[in-house]
Curated annotation (Swiss-Prot):
L-citrulline binds at residues 87, 123, 127, 175, 260, 272. It comes from the Bacteria. Keywords: Amino-acid biosynthesis, Arginine biosynthesis, ATP-binding, Cytoplasm, Ligase, Nucleotide-binding. ATP binds at residues 10-18, 117. It is found in: Cytoplasm. It is an enzyme of class 6 (ligase). GO terms for biological process: argininosuccinate metabolic process; L-arginine biosynthetic process; urea cycle. Gene3D superfamilies: Argininosuccinate synthetase, chain A, domain 2, HUPs, Single helix bin. It comes from Bacillus subtilis (strain 168). Homotetramer. GO terms for molecular function: argininosuccinate synthase activity; ATP binding. Pathway: Amino-acid biosynthesis; L-arginine biosynthesis; L-arginine from L-ornithine and carbamoyl phosphate: step 2/3. InterPro entries: Arginosuc_syn_C, Arginosuc_syn_N, Arginosuc_synth, Arginosuc_synth_CS, Arginosuc_synth_type_1_subfam, AS_cat/multimer_dom_body, Rossmann-like_a/b/a_fold. This is Argininosuccinate synthase.
Amino acid sequence: MSEQKKVVLAYSGGLDTSVAIKWLQEQGYNVIACCLDVGEGKDLAFVQQKALEVGATNSYVIDAKEEFAQDYALISLQAHTMYEGKYPLVSALSRPLIAKKLVEIAEKEDAQAIAHGCTGKGNDQVRFEVSIKSLNPDLEVIAPVREWQWSREEEIEYAASRGIPIPINLDSPYSIDQNLWGRANECGILEDPWAAPPEGAYDLTAPLEKTPDTPEVIEIAFEQGVPVSIDGVSYSLSELILKLNEMAGAHGVGRIDHVENRLVGIKSREVYECPGAMTLIKAHKELEDLTLVKEVAHFKPIIEQKMSEIIYNGLWFSPLKDALHAFLKETQKHVTGIVRVKLFKGHAIVEGRKSEYSLYDEKLATYTKDDAFDHHAAIGFIELWGLPTKVNSIVKKKEQIKA
């Protein structure tokens, strides 16, 4: 008798992946569950036990918050990744890390396959499967939800017939994904792009009507592009991001309502909450404005846009992403300093920045008697700078005379 095949399942503890355990067993697999906490606050012990009770032969739970912060969210921060100028890549950032852990466990357990709970309509199926195949091309990838194509009612009926616990929040109209970089929400009334998102769709941010009437001013310190403290108190990166989620979220910072172009070819209306991410990106950009030379500052946004597209499109483990990341790391060597930010009524407003590597020279910028700028040097500069345009104009006038 041949040995039963093994599959590692990306397990969330919800209905879809709980049903997937039983379904995969019925397809002849031993199911090994794997759940990561990337900052959404999962009860890992509960999820681990639930997977075993549903039928998994083994259940891994991994606290990956700091790894996610250091190796994934930090790249998003330093690259100011804003897909289509609005979305700081919440879900897109966690998928490659989850895929990496799934592959590691599959190799450890000698599993032949990896399974995920994505539908055939979203971006995540692409991100998971491209990442998995990039890391180990020999692993089979199974997508139970995409394969069975059941209605919600059929799925519940299947679960009930096999004794699978049905979550108490099943009646929620929303589909939510969350990590320390933010919260993504879709479905329900949000599918109508004209409908205003109800307050029930939000969790990390306060409505403007209920935010404090007094601004909160904070100071964020960076070392080589990495945020290290708030108001002089040091934190690990994951702790700092979560702390800023609380602080900025209380002031309503970071709400994003976005009709985006999905990788699979459709438009989708998403509501995001990214209070910590949006505050950090704004502060980091202001510190770069102080410390990067003009040529790098003007070229970097081109890299940022491409990096945003690559990550959104599931190409985290691509050679191009690695090459762009190498450029990015080079730009961060002198992005060290402190940024003062005012949090107030949905805004994170930068009010000051300072750095030992500042390229701002007040004596060159001032219009007072302390002005050290050589105004006479401007005469020759203007002549040479405008020379090509001047020559072009002279030639055109000669052509007009001939005509």
